[in-house]
Amino acid sequence: GQSNGKGSHAAFRMAYPGGSQWERLPDVPGGARVQPAASVQNNAYGPCFYLVGGFEPREGKKPAVVHTGGWCFEPRTNTWTRMADMKPHGRTDLMGMVGGQAINSGCAHIVFIGGVNRQIFEAAVNRPLVIEQLSANPEVHADSLNLLKQQETEYLTHPADWYRFNNELLIYHTITDTWITESQSPLLARACL
């Protein structure tokens, strides 16, 4: 998430039931994660906390990045372990999970629903940086710059289909560390805050 408007790596837990105080965990490795999906599910050793996808906001001249993987926190070792990237069996492209939801299925699966299209969202959140960079270059044609500014202004005005939200169930197996997709439906194509 964010803290004071900047991406954060902080992670906390509270004992359940009866907890009354937050306990700080080791920081989530890698880039900050805004709008990830999260779930508690079993791996081969017991319950773990899974944090998947999200995006690292732009910081200065560093562009925003949509994460294509996730991390598993194992309470028994108090450590984070990198999950496989979201490249489901048979796919050549990596997927992202920003603004989606996670639901447990059975004893070792997590089903992810919805979320933004990685390429469209990443282009949109980085468009202001691209405009800044191109505005500083006198060789850039004004029409190109105006088109980018128009795209920035119109980004939130398109019909829902234009955004190509994820319309497949994305399923992660916690023991084999693998991804598959299943079932396509426009009803799955949602993004939430």
Regions found by a protein language model. Give the residues of each.
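Kelch-like beta-propeller repeat domains
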Residues: G1-L193
